[in-house]
Amino acid sequence: MQTSHLFTALQQRQQQRDNRYLKGLVVILLLSLLISLCAGDIWLWPTQWFSETGRLFVWQLRLPRALAVLMVGASLAVSGAVMQALFENPLAEPGLLGVANGAGVALVMAVLLGHGLLPIWFLSACAIAGALLMTMLLLGFARRRLLTNARLLLVGVALGIVCSAIMTWAVYFSTSLDLRQLMYWMMGGFSGIDWRHQGLVLALLPIVLWLCCQGHVLNFMSLGEQQAQQLGVSLHLWRNLLVLAIGLLVGVSVALAGVISFIGLVIPHILRLTGLTDQRRLLAGCALAGGGILLLADIVARIALFSAELPIGVVTATLGAPLFIWLLTRVKSVK
């Protein structure tokens, strides 16, 4: 009985601590959103939001962009956490394993073949198809045990490099102005986002919410195939559903903002280091932290240069690459 009471007390303490972390992430997200609406070449404080200038810059330009950044950040972070559980690899994430680049290749080829005349929904469908194809290919390697986790990571990186090379060659040899402008898109950016793109942004919301509610399934899957099946989890069904959800999130995110790396890798690890290890709370934390961190990166991209804007993919890569190196050394030391 004493052991049972002790376990219950420890569990309640862990839940209280996790809830405090999640509340803190909500505060960070709201502050990031507030700063994002204020920041720019012209800083507009909340008291100026309803002026004539504020109605243009805040409500017509900055708000739709901030909502898109928030949802893309949440989508990439949640996708990274789910991929790490699916592949049983702590270094898995959409950008590193080539999933985002697969979506990018499909989108670039659609623009090339369509001469820049295809509607945004068709380009999004192509990006989703590319992301799904790459994810299923990698998952097939992982589940057939054809490759170790380390080799699977290298295969994903190699596929990502090949996809990047294809996109670069396509842009270089193109005479289409639309395709040449995709060079900026390939580095990631939200500069062209407005209210016309909010349909894609809203499409991300139900998928992110659904994934955040599947933490118990990922907890069961982490126990191993045999134990998960004994608990009534259909592994084949859930793997396909999760792969489909990841492909949708990554495909729409790439269609909106281009290829943005390291958000899906770094955010889950940072949250695990703070103690959020239960997938039921980790996924919600990833959604909040991913949105907040990408909002902060977008603010840096907008204000770092006067009258110019850095590609947000460059900002996340600059900040995320040192953390990725540290994670690699940490995984090696643990082994």
UniProtKB/Swiss-Prot annotation:
InterPro entries: ABC_BtuC-like, ABC_transptr_BtuC, ABC_transptr_permease_BtuC
Main location: membrane
Statement: the UniProt record of this protein carries the keyword DNA repair: no
Assigned GO CC terms: plasma membrane
Domain of life: Bacteria
Disulfide linkage: none
Record key words, sorted: Cell inner membrane, Cell membrane, Membrane, Transmembrane, Transmembrane helix, Transport
Subunit organization: The complex is composed of two ATP-binding proteins (BtuD), two transmembrane proteins (BtuC) and a solute-binding protein (BtuF).
Name of this protein: Vitamin B12 import system permease protein BtuC
Lineage of producing organism: Bacteria, Pseudomonadati, Pseudomonadota, Gammaproteobacteria, Enterobacterales
